[in-house]
Amino acid sequence: MKAIMAVGTTSHAGKSFLTAALCRLFNRKGWQVTPFKGQNMALNAYVTAGGGEMGHAQAVQAWAAGTIPRVEMNPILLKPQGNMTSQVIIKGKAVGVTTAVDYYQNYFEQGWQAIKESLAKLSAEFDLVVCEGAGSPAEINLKHRDLTNMRVAKYLDAATILVVDIDRGGAFAHVVGTLELLEPEERALIKGIVINKFRGQKSLLDSGITWLEDYTKIPVLGVLPYSDIFLSAEDSLSLLDRPAQKPKAELNIIVIRLPHIANFTDFDPLCGEATVNVRYLELQESLGDPDGVIIPGSKTTVADLIALNQSGMANQLQAYHQRGGIIFGICGGLQMLGRLILDTDHREGPESEAAGLNLLPLKTVITAEKITRQRQVLSNYPQGGLPVMGYEIHQGISQWESESGYQKMFEEDASLGIVNDSLSIWGCYLHGIFDNGSWRRTWLNHLRQRRGLLSLPTGIANYCEQREITLDNMANLLEEHLNLQPIFAHL
């Protein structure tokens, strides 16, 4: 199997973007393509048809490649959960909790074996693997235990592209410094450099590019302009880079930025609505009176609920509800809307319980079993009979303590979602719910009607179709601005 790899001089250099765009580009050229990231540390996860967890970014890359996401594309997923620990997921299944030091001792060999086995399976079905690195390949203190960057590139003899973010400054120093810190056999794999996120006239870079090529003896494949093309990101640092307020927005929705926020990709479809402003709010900020508030998922629900209470945000949310505000909780957010969360076995952390917001009649117990599965259901609210697809990822069971004044959101399963009779408090376990176009628009119309705004059409496509357009635009950007002949030559 032939291989390409994207590594970056820093985090957020554009590796995920470039990997997804390359997957779509080669898919359009008729290749059977698969993405691959040996080890990913992220709280944005996706659940495959088989019930396995993988990084959401690799799922997007799989769709870019025109194939179905599978756990072999991301055999190791580390999900940080506070106190310097992470949950370890290998081949889609949680196998333990570890610190960074213990991970190298206890999981390194198992992880490398999982990577090799996954690549063997993928090589039997695909012509080309497009790999993504993590962080920087030149972290001297981490290289001996790096399962994601040049170890994989050497194993596959991958044509490797080094991508650098010029928008943050210091791009030439980042490139030269990274190359200087690579071993000779690693540096020999670097077949091209991509300068990413450039604002301005490209000719201003010409002299610098000439110098860089002369000094490194590696071609600069091109300069990608700073683009407003939006692709799901891997971690919450990227929330700082979200697009500015939209001039035509009529609704304002707040997402509470929990300390351990997870699966905030749930809100990408809302960000894609031209009439909706989505703002991520820190716990110390003033809530105000938005049209809706969303409490997202969390990897450590009990700790984040305690933070919600201690910061005063819980009081703000309860006051907002008393004023008639709409609150929607997803997964951990649903659990926080209840009366109590119990973690007596300390599966999430040292805290054994936390009082909820008491806005839904639920009690949640954190359990040993982790539920990961895809779901297809029909809605009861905000309109009956709408098809809804999504997936569950939670380590807790919620029980209704009263049904009076509350309804089930979905026809098939009362435990999947709940809403009060006034349709002001919503909660569900379904990640990806806003990906469903008709359901999303119908829920937004509920908010619009409360503002006296006209309803928008609900017969719209699901978010996956909008994502397809985005992926094609990303591939078009590569075709317009990059010369990939040095990469093709290696293949």
UniProtKB/Swiss-Prot annotation:
Superkingdom of origin: Bacteria
One of the GO BP terms on file: cobalamin biosynthetic process
Cited InterPro entries: Class_I_gatase-like, CobQ/CobB/MinD/ParA_Nub-bd_dom, CobQ_GATase1, CobQ_N, CobQ_synth, GATase_3, P-loop_NTPase
Keywords: Cobalamin biosynthesis, Glutamine amidotransferase
Known pathway: Cofactor biosynthesis; adenosylcobalamin biosynthesis
Keyword hit for Aminoacyl-tRNA synthetase: no
Active site: 331, 431
Domain GATase cobBQ-type: residue ranges: 250-439
Similarity comment: Belongs to the CobB/CobQ family. CobQ subfamily.
Function (record text): Catalyzes amidations at positions B, D, E, and G on adenosylcobyrinic A,C-diamide. NH(2) groups are provided by glutamine, and one molecule of ATP is hydrogenolyzed for each amidation.
Protein name, entry field: Cobyric acid synthase
Species of provenance: Microcystis aeruginosa (strain NIES-843 / IAM M-2473)
